A protein has these predicted regions:
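An exposed, glycine/acidic-rich loop-and-rim segment of catalytic or binding clefts
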Residues: 1-230
Length: 230
C-alpha cells in the first residue's frame, strides 16, 4: 500500500510477505529495503528480529542504511526510490540504467513456508567501475554469530572472510546466528564469495559480498543470492 512520498513526490510503498508459523517480512521500495522481519514469540505474538521502520521518513533518515540495498560504496544510494511490483508471491524492485554509470538493477524478494527469505540481486549493462550489490540486513537481539570460512569458524568483526567451500554461482551455507536465551537460530546462505560481521548501535549484520569486485561488461548478467532461514 501507499506508505508516503519522497521529497520529489515519488510514491513510497510498503509490502508484506507472510508465511506459515506467523513469520512476516516487510519491504519498501525506498532503498529496496527490508523494513522489518517478524517471527512468533513464545506467547504466539510477533517479535521483531530486525530493526523496524514505522515510517518512510525514519527509513530514509537512517544513514546507516540498515535493511537497504547497497551498490558498491556509492554514497546516498540507499535513498533511491525503486520501481516495484508484485509477481504472485514475489516482490520485484527495479532501477533503470542511469547517467551515473550504473546498469539496470533489480532485487527479488521471496518468502516460503519453510521460513526461507531469499534476496536476489540482478544487474545487466557495462560499468566502468567495479560493481557489487548487497542488502545490509541488521538483526537485533542477543545474537552470537559464527561465520563458515576457509580459515575455520570465525566470530571476529570487521574484515571480509572467504566463505568455506565457495563455488561461483552456487548457493552455500555461510553463517549462522544463535540466540540461546530466545531459542532462535538464523542460517545464512549466499552465492557471494565473502562474508563479514558489521555492528551498529548494538545490532549486527552478516554482510555477504565481494571485497574485490570487477566491472561488468555488456554480456554478463550479474546475479547474486542470499537466503535467511529463520
Amino acid at each position: 500500500y501507499l506508505w508516503g512520498a519522497s521529497a520529489e513526490g515519488e510514491g513510497i510503498l510498503l509490502y508484506t510477505l507472510r508465511c506459515a508459523g506467523g513469520r512476516e517480512v516487510r519491504l519498501s521500495n525506498a532503498g529496496a529495503a527490508v523494513t522489518g522481519i517478524f517471527a512468533a514469540g513464545a506467547d504466539g505474538r510477533p517479535e521483531a528480529l530486525t530493526p523496524v521502520f514505522e515510517t518512510p521518513e525514519a527509513l530514509l533518515a537512517d544513514y546507516a542504511d540498515r535493511g537497504k540495498t547497497l551498490c558498491a560504496n556509492r554514497y546516498g544510494f540507499g535513498q533511491r526510490i525503486w520501481q516495484s511490483r508484485v509477481e504472485t508471491d514475489r516482490i520485484v524492485m527495479e532501477l533503470p540504467a542511469g547517467d551515473d554509470g550504473l546498469p539496470v538493477m533489480a532485487v527479488l524478494f521471496d518468502l516460503d513456508d519453510d521460513g526461507q527469505f531469499a534476496v536476489t540481486h540482478l544487474a545487466r549493462g557495462a560499468t566502468a567501475a567495479p560493481f557489487t550489490m548487497t542488502t545490509q540486513l541488521f538483526w537485533q537481539g542477543d545474537w552470537r554469530p559464527t561465520l563458515r570460512t576457509q580459515e575455520g569458524p570465525a566470530t571476529d568483526d570487521g574484515r571480509f572472510y572467504p566463505v568455506e567451500g565457495w563455488r561461483q554461482n552456487i548457493l552455500g551455507e555461510a553463517a549462522r546466528l544463535d540466540d540461546p536465551a530466545a531459542g532462535r537460530t538464523i542460517e545464512i546462505l549466499t552465492s557471494q564469495p565473502e562474508i563479514r560481521i558489521v555492528r551498529h548501535d548494538g545490532q549486527l549484520a552478516l554482510l555477504c559480498g565481494d571485497s574485490r569486485p570487477t566491472p561488468l561488461d555488456d554480456e554478463t548478467l550479474y546475479c547474486q543470492k542470499d537466503v535467511y532461514r529463520f
